[in-house]
From Swiss-Prot:
GO terms for biological process: basement membrane organization; caveola assembly; cell differentiation; cell population proliferation; chemical synaptic transmission; endoplasmic reticulum organization; endothelial cell proliferation; insulin receptor signaling pathway. This is Caveolin-2. Disulfide bonds: none annotated. Residues 87-107 dip into the membrane without crossing it. The gene is Cav2.
Amino acid sequence: MGLETEKADVQLFMADDAYSHHSVVDYTDPEKYVDSSQDRDPHQLNSHLKLGFEDLIAEPPTTHSFDKVWICSHALFEISKYVIYKFLTVFLAIPLAFIAGILFATLSCLHIWILMPFVKTCLMVLPSVQTIWKSVTDVVIGPLCTSVGRIFSSVSMQLSHD
């Protein structure tokens, strides 16, 4: 027993396939996964956002604008949608992903360490509470309801047409 003065020399060696991959992306080589054909919405969570120019702006056959106006409007719509989306994701995607990660981690921790133990404790205590509640019901509420029922059973009403 005493003060240790030696430095510990610890190194961790892991093969690339030794740890669990929770996502498809291999973070050791992200350039390998810059495939634009990859489906980033496999569960179709945002299928309602797949709108095009024709879904938003439509001219009936009787009223058409000039062809050049239609083509320029379509091009400007697509370019602005692309540029603004890229611009917003550059500034918002990482902070919002960080906030969402913190939020989900906090909710998971609260659920695992506070909510479920509380629910299990309540379910464990419930049989004795159920016995006490049945006794209170039999002793207090049962006779009270019986008395009120007998009082109202002796009431009679007669309707007469005048």
